[in-house]
């Protein structure tokens, strides 16, 4: 999430715009697409073609474990979806909402590595305006996008909510919190979450204004599933205090992971990241 200039901050304060404009300023940095989806003659099967920028780290055999398709949202956009079969005996599937400056092509290698290490399959999607998804990124589209992904995961693959872990990273915590506040699932994982858009731009903000965007802080108490929060203590984009504030509002918090010294984009490089996820998925969820 990019910083606003002084003039832009003054404009926000003096002439508060609608939440959608705040969202666009703060959040969306879609990269040039790192992949394409090619449909076969039947119109039912899509093939994933990665560019060099996707930095694919695995063999063609692992790539065959990835299934891609397009689905339509309630707002009329077609979004790209990806199902990664990482483990044949996986009990859980992560519904993964990624960060603001990547697409599915860039995340595909990470998904295979993560899923195979914590014994979970991974379902992900690109936001409207990202990758092969149509439309433009916006707060309203974020919510419609994850709704479409949730429906596709349940109907196309028959995965029940009690076997879905809703996982959001950075801006991806926004649709994740919104969905989890409306539907119960096995668990929720929030990785470098934000409390709200205004609180990122104005750290001293104490309440949610009508023109605020991404109000996770006002929704998180509605989540009835167990919530694991992960945040780096030296996060330079979304301050560590956001993770703490959300943790304090959770109905069913589990032991959080505060990664000492980690920033916004390197939490997963620390050994305790995988250790905490493994413990949560393979041990704690069984007893919750």
Swiss-Prot record:
Pfam families: Hydrolase_4. Its main location: membrane. Palmitoylated on cysteine residues located in a cysteine cluster at the N-terminus which promotes membrane localization. Disulfide bonds: none annotated. It is a lipid-anchor. Signal peptide: none annotated. The keyword Methyltransferase does not apply. InterPro entries: AB_hydrolase_fold, Hydrolase_4. One of its GO terms (molecular function) is palmitoyl-(protein) hydrolase activity. Keywords: Cell membrane, Cell projection, Endosome, Hydrolase, Lipoprotein, Membrane, Palmitate, Postsynaptic cell membrane, Synapse. The keyword Membrane applies. SUPFAM superfamilies: alpha/beta-Hydrolases. It catalyses: S-hexadecanoyl-L-cysteinyl-[protein] + H2O = L-cysteinyl-[protein] + hexadecanoate + H(+). Its EC number is 3.1.2.22. It comes from the Eukaryota. The active site is at residues 170, 235, 264. It is found in: Cell membrane; Recycling endosome membrane; Cell projection, Dendritic spine; Postsynaptic density membrane. GO terms for cellular component: dendritic spine; postsynaptic density membrane; recycling endosome membrane. Belongs to the AB hydrolase superfamily. ABHD17 family. Hydrolyzes fatty acids from S-acylated cysteine residues in proteins. This is Alpha/beta hydrolase domain-containing protein 17B. The lineage of its organism: Eukaryota, Metazoa, Chordata, Craniata, Vertebrata.
